[in-house]
């Protein structure tokens, strides 16, 4: 009697999900026990989120940062299924896709990613723009082109949240809009980039000042209208005209994850063990934005792309170990520093004893992210384009 091939189902094709699938495909399963690996995502493309900002300034093209899953998974043995998850039966580990097939699996990986909460103030759902997905970038690009084509005197942009995303967006948009832009950064606390190294925070402050970005600290958003934003500063309400409001504050877990009968924290994140297994469910793994994860030392980890990237290696190994009778490894996070883009051809980085800003940091950031691209083939294509594009531009001119 032949033994049925085990199946691993990975829900979500972001850093956590895709990189787990790719790593699993490389691990040495015994031939008779080699599992079927299924990756499910509602989109047809992976998105290298840290480089999404470069689309706004035409520094990068869509294919470079958002290659199709089918291209990335070619010859890996991983099966890609595009669809929206509409139901997960935890007890039987069965996954139902909207207008799609149903999967039963032996190991389930939850890596569905987070969402931007737009329901925190009145009017945000209707009028604010989020910036997390390729669709978000296209929607913002369409609005920018419309405003640029109108030849208005000024294009007024308010960005809510002076964390990493808010600061990076402010610098890119200020560079794109130039003299026409009036970019405002709104932050509830008394400091921008609170968790950032001091070197990066200083570099960001200088970049924002150079680009004449207004920074409103200790300021709350009261409401957002079709062409206004209402700000509260020390009890005084100001209503300002605005053309675009970008909302970068917060990450929330989708309702599909919140509804699962699994242990969760107050934010709805799934609570995992140091081996990235769901508490009381060793056959289900979770990583990325939807998981509350503590490493081997008990330290609670941030929900960043860098953490998800490293979690993927451990998740893949621990799934392999659980299927082949090997010991599982507790996750050990290695902080590799922090990088931010601060406008066109400008960045800052701090970590591993290195501190850089300006164009040199921009080049180092690009090379670091090129190395992190999902597959060697894609690294080669993108790397060659980065080398050849300046030469092509020079020849055109």
Where are the language model's segments positioned?
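FAD-site-proximal beta/loop scaffold in flavoenzymes
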Residues: 126-153, 239-310, 317
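C-terminal, flexible cofactor-proximal segment of oxidoreductases
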Residues: 311, 316-397
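A Rossmann-like FAD-binding core segment of flavoenzymes
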Residues: 76, 80-87, 175-274, 278-280, ...
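Beta1-alpha1 glycine-rich phosphate/pyrophosphate-binding loop at the start
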Residues: 2-79, 158, 167-196
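FAD-binding core/adjacent interface of flavoenzyme oxidoreductases
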Residues: 1-7, 75-158, 232-235, 246
